Amino acid sequence: MSKHTVLFELGCEELPPKSLKTLRDALQAETVKGLNEAGLDFASVEAYAAPRRLALKIVDVDAAQADTQKRFDGPAVQAAYDAEGKPTKALEGFMRGQGITVDQLSTFQAGKVEKVCYLKDVKGQSLDALLPQILQTALDNLPIAKRMRSAASRTEFVRPVKWVVLLKDDQVIEATIQDHKAGNVTYGHRFHAPEAVTLAHANDYLAALEKAYVVANFEKRQATIQEQVKKLADEVNATAIVPADLLDEVTSLVEWPVALRATFEERYLAVPQEALITTMQDNQKYFCLINAEGKLQPYFITVSNIESKDSTQIIEGNEKVVRPRLSDAEFFFLQDQKQPLASRKEKLANMVFQAQLGTLWDKSTRIAKLAVALSSITGANPADAEKAALLAKCDLTSELVGEFPELQGIAGTYYARIEGENTEVSEALGEQYLPKFAGDVLPKTKTGTTIALADRLDTLVGIFGIGQAPTGSKDPFALRRSAIGILRLIIENELDVTIEELVNLALQGYGDIVKDHDKTRADAVAFLEGRYRAKYEDQGVAVDVLQAVQALAPKSPLDFDKRVNAVNHFRTLPEAAALAAANKRVANILAKEAAPEGSVIEANLVEDAEKALFAELQAVTPVVEPLLAAKDYTAALSKLAALRAPIDAFFDGVMVMADDADLKANRLRLLAQLRNLFTAVADVSVLQG
């Protein structure tokens, strides 16, 4: 069967930049799905996207579906013919329905019954006939929240459609898609090459558009932007901040990217750089530049969609646009400094945290008391922790945070520095919200760690205390994410504390506000322990490793983490699979018949294999016990791995359930001793493979 290259392009008005990549990928996926469902084989489907177009190139696609046979089932052979071999009424009805004669019948075996059938030859449809509907269906299935149409069109799309290209090699496939007749004419850059571009062949698409100042390949356009931005940054010994989302959005805004470096007045560098970066990235789509120390430089890079003969005008235009925004940030920053942070508590007293849990000032005072209590665990200075907690939410009343909500905490740090607070206090104000997401950095200061813990614990315990724990997809206070943050703060700072101890400390701040302390404690502890799985799955830890540790229900997150790491390492040992299987066998035996109380009686060991296992246990136990006491679980399991050979020999040569009651009891005690050594770390019997 012959193969062809197909080009499809949908031209339209400017597509939403934040959706362009998603639309491209969805169009590709839906088209692949349609081709597969139609039984059309192909080598690849390449997808392209630019501000005014979505396109696909289908490589080496079949010219048509393969011819097939469709089977229509009739009556059983026994019921199809009478004693004389003539068709019965049942068979005649079947033939009449299919419009066939006896000589066109076949038979097939349906289980034990032979049946009559008609095998109808079905000629495969051509690519030309199938493709228009495949593409239209793909367009209809795109994830578009709100569709629109132009006045002359009956069909809807995310933006009004202007033209459609559908080429099979060098031939136009006759089709009407999105109310537009397909052709071989596309259009170049709106300003540099607005005239029509006739495509002679599907393979000419990318090159023809590049001549018309359009880079249709999204990744190529993006790489060009990255190269240009890096070059401009290097010229001033700086590094560009290039967030992935911003890069995607800028790539979606231009057909012919031209990066230009502009400047702003150095006086604005006195403003918190986070505010300047936010306004330049979010509002202007600029790439900001920083030096080797991470300090903002008085430059920014804009990406133009025009290759201008005089780029100075474009640069000056952008500098003129950004100046008022930077001035606004400067104004807010200076205005806020007229009111010290500590004096803002009155405004916090009028800001509701949660109707039943009080105002933000109520929360601040609870956090302060909790932070003092936590200081003995985190090693923070109690006075610093208390002061930082009382100042922590004050910047929420500032004009800078009002304009840039993402600066909460960060603004507080700047104001605290200006007011002369020490580093522990000032840095803690910004660190209180860390970690913000999975993989985010943690606070660097002990005070920051303390406030971050106190804030999260206060919210979690309070919300559970009023019966508003997360349910299903509802988690308005982001407690699931917050819980993982609590676990990380404990584990990565190596805080030796149990979850219940922390919850109890947080409960003390609520007094009578929380009516049922026992239920709240139990629910909050269970919730935090239930977040281990999400935390470790993000790190790639297997579920059975978690199950092995959870079987012991460790109370301390730090202890839990050490056990997880130990079991993870244990799984890499060559003895692991055999020892896991042996432990499972031991667990099953002891589940059916528990070991009698008492120690193993050496005189009752009669088989060489059980004597050898006992000797190994006696030798390894005094080595392992100090490791367990020191919580060096990785080393403990590594030592226990040496028991593989004597355990295997034991099960190969010893009958545990002996007829002699004393021998059986002794062997059960031996297995219990073995089991207890392993379960001092984790239940490795649940490990798979």
Curated annotation (Swiss-Prot):
GO terms for molecular function: arginine-tRNA ligase activity; ATP binding; glycine-tRNA ligase activity. It holds the Pfam family tRNA_synt_2f. The keyword Aminoacyl-tRNA synthetase applies. Its EC number is 6.1.1.14. Keywords: Aminoacyl-tRNA synthetase, ATP-binding, Cytoplasm, Ligase, Nucleotide-binding, Protein biosynthesis. Belongs to the class-II aminoacyl-tRNA synthetase family. This is Glycine--tRNA ligase beta subunit. It comes from Acinetobacter baumannii (strain ATCC 17978 / DSM 105126 / CIP 53.77 / LMG 1025 / NCDC KC755 / 5377).
